[in-house]
C-alpha cells in the first residue's frame, strides 16, 4: 500500500489535470470549483476503504456501496427513533459495522480467499443484492429523507454563495486518508498489513497471522464506510440501491490510481469530481456527468496501456 509520500508519474498527471480544470472554472464560475472539491471528497472518502480491502485482502468488494447504504439507513432509524441529531450515530455505526465486518468476513469472505477472482466477484456481487433486497423489504424502495436543518446552510462571500455542510466530506476525506496512512505506517498491525498486501507468503513465513490481518483490515474498512453512510444520509435521500453507483466509481478510481495507491485516489477523485462539476454546470448537460466520469476513466486506462506497450 502506498501512503502519503512520494508521488507517482500518473499522480502528477492527475494533479495537472485537476489544476487546469480548477483554474478554468475558478476564473469563470468559482462556485463550481467548490462543488467539485466537495464532490471529489465524497468520492475519495468512499473509495479509500475499498482500496484498503483490495490492496491488502485482495478482494474486490462489490457490496461496498451497499454497506454505506446500510449505514445511511442506520442513521435514519437512529434519528427517527431517538429524535437526536443523526450525526451522533457515527460512533455506534462504526462499532456496529466493525462487528458486521467480522461476521461478513468469517461467513462469506474467508471461505473464498484464494479462490478464482470470478468466484469472489460473484460472491460480493450477490452479497450486495442480498443487502439491497433486505433494505427493500425492511424500508421499501421509497426514498427516505432526514430533516436536518443545518445541512442546508449556505455561506455568501461577495457574489459567491455555496453550501457549507458538504465541506464535511472534505474533512472526512482528509481525516480518513491520514488515519489510514498513520495506521499503516506507525502501528504493528498496519505494518503487518502492508507486508501481507505486498507478499502474503513471505509475511506468513515471518510469523504474521494472515487471516487475523485480513479480518482486521476488512472489518475496519466496513466500519469506515458504515460511518460515511451516516454522514451521507444527512444530506441525501436514502434508498436500497443508492450505494451501487458509488461502488462502481470507487472501483474505477482504484483502477486509475493503481491497486494499493491511496494517495493517487485523492488526486484522481479531484480530477473526476471537478470534471463532473463542470459538466453539471452547463445548462442541459447535467445528465452527461456520469458519462464523462467513465469516459475519462476509459481514456486514462487506454493511454496508460499504450504507454506501457511503448516501453
PLM features: residue spans?
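Transmembrane helix-bundle core of multi-pass membrane transporters
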Residues: 112-186, 213-216, 281, 285, ...
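Alpha-helical transmembrane segments within multi-pass membrane transporters and channels
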Residues: 83-127, 134, 267-272
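Hydrophobic alpha-helical segments within and immediately flanking transmembrane helices
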Residues: 42-50, 63-81, 92, 100, ...
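Helix-loop-helix "hairpin" substructures at the membrane interface of multi-pass membrane proteins
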Residues: 161-238, 265-267
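Inter-helical junctions in multi-pass inner-membrane proteins, predominant
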Residues: 27-39, 180-184, 214-257, 277-291
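Cytosolic-side transmembrane-helix boundaries in multi-pass membrane proteins
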Residues: 1-22, 138, 198-212, 279, ...
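Single transmembrane alpha-helix segments in multi-pass membrane proteins
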Residues: 30-79, 104-115, 119, 257-262, ...
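Membrane-interfacial amphipathic/re-entrant helices at transmembrane-helix boundaries
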Residues: 1-47, 74, 85-89, 115-120, ...
Amino acid at each position: 500500500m502506498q501512503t502519503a509520500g512520494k508521488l507517482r508519474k500518473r499522480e502528477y498527471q492527475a494533479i495537472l489535470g485537476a489544476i487546469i480544470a480548477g483554474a478554468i472554472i475558478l476564473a469563470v464560475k468559482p462556485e463550481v470549483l467548490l462543488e467539485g472539491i466537495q464532490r471529489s471528497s465524497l468520492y475519495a472518502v468512499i473509495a479509500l476503504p475499498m482500496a484498503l480491502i483490495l490492496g491488502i485482502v485482495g478482494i474486490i468488494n462489490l457490496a461496498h456501496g451497499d454497506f454505506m447504504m446500510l449505514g445511511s439507513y442506520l442513521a435514519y432509524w437512529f434519528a427517527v427513533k431517538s429524535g437526536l441529531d443523526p450525526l451522533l450515530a457515527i460512533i455506534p455505526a462504526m462499532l456496529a459495522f466493525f462487528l458486521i465486518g467480522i461476521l461478513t468476513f468469517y461467513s462469506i469472505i474467508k471461505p473464498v480467499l484464494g479462490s478464482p477472482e470470478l468466484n469472489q466477484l460473484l460472491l460480493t456481487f450477490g452479497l450486495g443484492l442480498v443487502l439491497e433486497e433486505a433494505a427493500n423489504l425492511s424500508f421499501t424502495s421509497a426514498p427516505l429523507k432526514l430533516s436536518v436543518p443545518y445541512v442546508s446552510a449556505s455561506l455568501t462571500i461577495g457574489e459567491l454563495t455555496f453550501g457549507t455542510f458538504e465541506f464535511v466530506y472534505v474533512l472526512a476525506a482528509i481525516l480518513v486518508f491520514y488515519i489510514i496512512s498513520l495506521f499503516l505506517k506507525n502501528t504493528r498491525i498496519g505494518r503487518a498489513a502492508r507486508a501481507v498486501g505486498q507478499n502474503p507468503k513471505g509475511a506468513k513465513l515471518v510469523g504474521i497471522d494472515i487471516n487475523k490481518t485480513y479480518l482486521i483490515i476488512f472489518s475496519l474498512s466496513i466500519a469506515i464506510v458504515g460511518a460515511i453512510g451516516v454522514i451521507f444520509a444527512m444530506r441525501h435521500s436514502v434508498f436500497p440501491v443508492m450505494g451501487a453507483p458509488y461502488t462502481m466509481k470507487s472501483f474505477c478510481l482504484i483502477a486509475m490510481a493503481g491497486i494499493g495507491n491511496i494517495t493517487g485516489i485523492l488526486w484522481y477523485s479531484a480530477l473526476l469530481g471537478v470534471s463532473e462539476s463542470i459538466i453539471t454546470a452547463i445548462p442541459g448537460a447535467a445528465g452527461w456527468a456520469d458519462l464523462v466520469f467513465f469516459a475519462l476513466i476509459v481514456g486514462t486506462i487506454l493511454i496508460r496501456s499504450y504507454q506501457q506497450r511503448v516501453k
